[in-house]
Amino acid sequence: MGLSLRVRRRGGSVSKKEIIPVTSCSEEVEITIPSQFQCPISYELMKDPVIIASGITYDRENIEKWFESGYQTCPVTNTVLTSLEQIPNHTIRRMIQGWCGSSLGGGIERIPTPRVPVTSHQVSEICERLSAATRRGDYAACMEMVTKMTRLGKESERNRKCVKENGAGLVLCVCFDAFSENANASLLLEETVSVLTWMLPIGLEGQSKLTTTSSFNRLVELLRNGDQNAAFLIKELLELNVTHVHALTKINGVQEAFMKSINRDSTCVNSLISIHHMILTNQETVSRFLELDLVNITVEMLVDSENSVCEKALTVLNVICETKEGREKVRRNKLVIPILVKKILKISEKKDLVSVMWKVCKSGDGSEVEEALRLGAFKKLVVMLQVGCGEGTKEKVTELLKMMNKVMKMNGFVDRSYSSSIEFKHVKKPF
C-alpha cells in the first residue's frame, strides 16, 4: 500500500510539528517530530545536523545560509561566535536515522548519512595533482581529478564554493588549453568545460588560456556538436572582453557552428547572444552570417518561440539592420512586418522590436508602413506610449506614428483596429 506524507504545525505552534502519513484508505496516523530532531531555524527534521561554537545543533544547510547572509551570531542564543566552524553531530544524526527507521515500521524514509564537505586543503591537493598531471600530459590523471571536481560540485553548493575559492578555475583553464590540440581528449575537454560553467567569473589569466586559437577551436567544435556548456562558456567569454570577440571571429567555421547551434533549444539563447557580440565587431562578420541565412532563421524564431528567444533574436536583427545589406535582407522577408506588429504588446523588452520596425519602415518604399498600418500597428504603438517606454524608443515610436498618420491622410486609409473609444491618457499627440 502506498504511503504519502503531509506536514503541518499543531495549533500554530512553532515548537511542534507533525508528520501525517496518509494511506490510500485515507487513514491518518500522527507522528510528532521530537524537538531535539528539529532544526531551530526551520523547525524541520534535520538531515545533516552540525554543532556550532555556541553548542547548539542546526541543520547544515540552514545554518550555512544564516552565515552567508552575514550573521556571525547563534540564531538561538544570539551570542557572537568566535568561530563559524560546523562540526557534524553524529550522535543526533544516528538518533534521527534510528527514529526514522522505527516510525511506522519504516514508513518514514530514513535520512541518508551526509557526505563530509570538502575542505580547502583537499581542493588545493586536487588542484596540485591536476596541475602536475597537465604538465606531464597525463590524460588519465587529469580526467580523474576533473571528474573528482565534478562529483564534489554535484554533492553540494558549499562544495562548489570551496572548489571555486581555492584556485580550481585557473588550473582547469590551463588543463583545457594544454589538451586543446589533442584530438583524443574530447571527453576530458567536455568535462572541464562542464566544471568551468560554475567557476565564473574567470580571471584574466584563465581567460588568456581559454581564448587561444587552439582553445577556441575546441570550444567551437564542442559547440558544433551541441554542447550547451560550451555555448554558455563562449557567451560568458565574449561578454568579458571585446578582444575575445575578435579572436573568436577568426576561428574557421565559427559562423557555421553558431548557425547550427541556434537551431537547438539547449544552446539557442546563449548562441544568439554570442552572435550579437560577433556582428557588432565588423561588416565582414555580418556579411558571412547573412550568406548563411541568419535573417530568415531569426525571423522564423519569432513566430512561436518563447519570449526570451524572441528578445535575443530581435537584438540580432536590430544590429543586422544597421547595415544596408542587412536591412534589405530583413525587408525582403514577408514575415517581418506581420510578426513585429503581432509581438508589439506581447514581449516585455520592446526596444529592439521598435528599432527594427523603425529601420525597416524608414528605409523602405512605403509598403512596409502601409502593411503595418493595415495590421493594427498604429493602435498598439499608441498603447506603448500610453504605458511608457525609454526615451530613445519613444522617439522611434513617435516617428513611426507620424509615418503612419501621413499614409492615412494621403490614402484615406482607416485603421479598422483603431477604436475611437480608447482613452489615450497622458499621451501627447505629435503625430
From Swiss-Prot:
Top-rank taxon, per record: Eukaryota
Pathway: Protein modification; protein ubiquitination
A Pfam entry, by short name: U-box
Domain U-box: 32-106
SUPFAM superfamilies in UniProt: ARM repeat, RING/U-box
Keyword check for Transferase: yes
Any one GO MF annotation of this record: ubiquitin protein ligase activity
Documented EC number(s): 2.3.2.27
InterPro entries: ARM-like, ARM-type_fold, PUB22/23/24-like, RING-Ubox_PUB, Ubox_domain, Znf_RING/FYVE/PHD
Catalytic activity field: S-ubiquitinyl-[E2 ubiquitin-conjugating enzyme]-L-cysteine + [acceptor protein]-L-lysine = [E2 ubiquitin-conjugating enzyme]-L-cysteine + N(6)-ubiquitinyl-[acceptor protein]-L-lysine
Biological processes annotated in GO: protein ubiquitination
Keywords attached to this entry: Transferase, Ubl conjugation pathway
Tagged with keyword Glycosyltransferase: no
PANTHER family hit by this protein: U-BOX DOMAIN-CONTAINING PROTEIN 20 (PTHR22849:SF129), WDSAM1 PROTEIN (PTHR22849)
Record's function text: Functions as an E3 ubiquitin ligase.
Protein's UniProt name: U-box domain-containing protein 20
Organism expressing this protein natively: Arabidopsis thaliana
Upper classification of the organism: Eukaryota, Viridiplantae, Streptophyta, Embryophyta, Tracheophyta
